[in-house]
C-alpha cells in the first residue's frame, strides 16, 4: 500500500521563498540534507520515478523549495517538500546565509509540516549544518513533529559498520527514527515507505 501511494507523486510547484508556497491543509513531509547526501536518489527510489526529484531542478531552481503532491484517484492527501541540499562549496556565502534563513523559516513556521526526513551519509555522520538543523526543529519535534534520519548509501558500509552507524545516529537523533537505506541494494525502502505512509495518514494506522 505504501509504495503504491508513493508512486502517485507528481510535481506540484516550486518556490524561492516560503511566502510563495501555497497554503495547504494536507500533511507535508520535508526532505532535507547536505549536498550529495543522496536526497534526490532517495526520493526517486521511494516514488519509483527515476527523474521526479530532478525534473524541477532546472538551472536557476536549485535553491528553491519543490513540492510534490501524493494521492490516489487524483485526490491529494499529502505533499513532499524537497528542500535544496545545503553546504554547496560553489555557492557564495551570502547566498548560503540567505538560503539557511529561508530553510529555518520554513521548518519553524510551515503550519502543515508533519514530518522531517534528514538524509545523512553514514560515512561522514552529522555535519555542522545537520546539527544546526536539528537544533532548529527540536522545539517542534518536542511538540510532536515526526522526525526520521535516513542513513543513505548504506551499501558503502560493511554490516558491522552499518550496525555501528545506526547505534551512533540513534543517540544523536534524540528520539527520532533512524533507518539504513540503499537505493542500489533496495535496503530500507519498504521500512521508510511505511513510516511515511503512517505519518501522512495517522488516522488509518499501519499500512
UniProtKB/Swiss-Prot annotation:
<feature type="binding site">
    <location>
        <position position="62"/>
    </location>
    <ligand>
        <name>Mg(2+)</name>
    </ligand>
</feature>
<keyword id="KW-0547">Nucleotide-binding</keyword>
<keyword id="KW-0131">Cell cycle</keyword>
<comment type="similarity">
    <text>Belongs to the TRAFAC class TrmE-Era-EngA-EngB-Septin-like GTPase superfamily. EngB GTPase family.</text>
</comment>
<feature type="binding site">
    <location>
        <begin position="33"/>
        <end position="40"/>
    </location>
    <ligand>
        <name>GTP</name>
    </ligand>
</feature>
<feature type="binding site">
    <location>
        <begin position="82"/>
        <end position="85"/>
    </location>
    <ligand>
        <name>GTP</name>
    </ligand>
</feature>
<keyword id="KW-0717">Septation</keyword>
<keyword id="KW-0479">Metal-binding</keyword>
<keyword id="KW-0342">GTP-binding</keyword>
<dbReference type="InterPro" id="IPR027417">
    <property type="entry name" value="P-loop_NTPase"/>
</dbReference>
<dbReference type="InterPro" id="IPR030393">
    <property type="entry name" value="G_ENGB_dom"/>
</dbReference>
<keyword id="KW-0132">Cell division</keyword>
<dbReference type="Pfam" id="PF01926">
    <property type="entry name" value="MMR_HSR1"/>
</dbReference>
<dbReference type="GO" id="GO:0000917">
    <property type="term" value="P:division septum assembly"/>
</dbReference>
<dbReference type="GO" id="GO:0005525">
    <property type="term" value="F:GTP binding"/>
</dbReference>
<feature type="binding site">
    <location>
        <begin position="152"/>
        <end position="155"/>
    </location>
    <ligand>
        <name>GTP</name>
    </ligand>
</feature>
<feature type="binding site">
    <location>
        <begin position="181"/>
        <end position="183"/>
    </location>
    <ligand>
        <name>GTP</name>
    </ligand>
</feature>
<dbReference type="InterPro" id="IPR019987">
    <property type="entry name" value="GTP-bd_ribosome_bio_YsxC"/>
</dbReference>
<feature type="binding site">
    <location>
        <begin position="60"/>
        <end position="64"/>
    </location>
    <ligand>
        <name>GTP</name>
    </ligand>
</feature>
<dbReference type="InterPro" id="IPR006073">
    <property type="entry name" value="GTP-bd"/>
</dbReference>
<dbReference type="GO" id="GO:0046872">
    <property type="term" value="F:metal ion binding"/>
</dbReference>
<feature type="binding site">
    <location>
        <position position="40"/>
    </location>
    <ligand>
        <name>Mg(2+)</name>
    </ligand>
</feature>
<dbReference type="GO" id="GO:0005829">
    <property type="term" value="C:cytosol"/>
</dbReference>
<comment type="function">
    <text>Necessary for normal cell division and for the maintenance of normal septation.</text>
</comment>
<keyword id="KW-0460">Magnesium</keyword>
<protein>
    <recommendedName>
        <fullName>Probable GTP-binding protein EngB</fullName>
    </recommendedName>
</protein>
<feature type="domain" description="EngB-type G">
    <location>
        <begin position="25"/>
        <end position="202"/>
    </location>
</feature>
Amino acid at each position: 500500500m505504501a509504495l503504491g501511494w508513493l508512486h502517485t507523486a507528481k510535481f506540484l510547484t516550486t518556490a524561492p521563498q516560503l511566502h510563495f508556497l501555497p497554503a495547504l491543509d494536507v500533511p507535508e513531509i520535508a526532505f532535507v540534507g547536505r549536498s550529495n547526501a543522496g536526497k534526490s536518489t532517495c526520493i526517486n527510489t521511494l516514488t519509483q520515478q527515476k527523474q521526479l526529484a530532478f525534473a524541477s531542478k532546472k538551472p536557476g531552481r536549485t535553491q528553491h523549495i519543490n513540492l510534490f503532491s501524493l494521492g490516489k484517484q487524483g485526490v491529494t492527501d499529502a505533499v513532499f517538500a524537497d528542500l535544496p541540499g545545503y553546504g554547496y562549496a560553489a555557492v557564495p556565502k551570502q547566498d548560503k546565509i540567505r538560503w539557511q534563513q529561508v530553510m529555518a523559516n520554513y521548518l519553524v513556521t510551515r503550519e502543515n509540516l508533519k514530518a522531517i526526513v534528514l538524509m545523512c551519509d553514514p560515512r561522514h555522520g552529522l555535519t555542522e549544518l545537520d546539527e544546526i538543523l536539528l537544533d532548529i526543529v527540536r522545539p517542534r519535534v518536542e511538540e510532536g513533529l515526526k522526525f526520521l534520519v535516513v542513513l543513505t548509501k548504506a551499501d558503502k558500509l560493511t554490516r558491522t559498520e552499518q550496525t555501528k552507524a545506526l547505534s551512533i545516529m540513534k543517540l544523536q537523533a534524540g528520539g527520532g527514527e533512524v533507518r539504513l537505506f540503499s537505493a542500489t541494494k533496495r535496503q530500507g525502502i519498504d521500512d521508510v515507505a511505511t513510516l511515511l505512509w503512517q505519518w501522512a495518514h495517522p488516522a488509518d494506522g499501519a499500512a
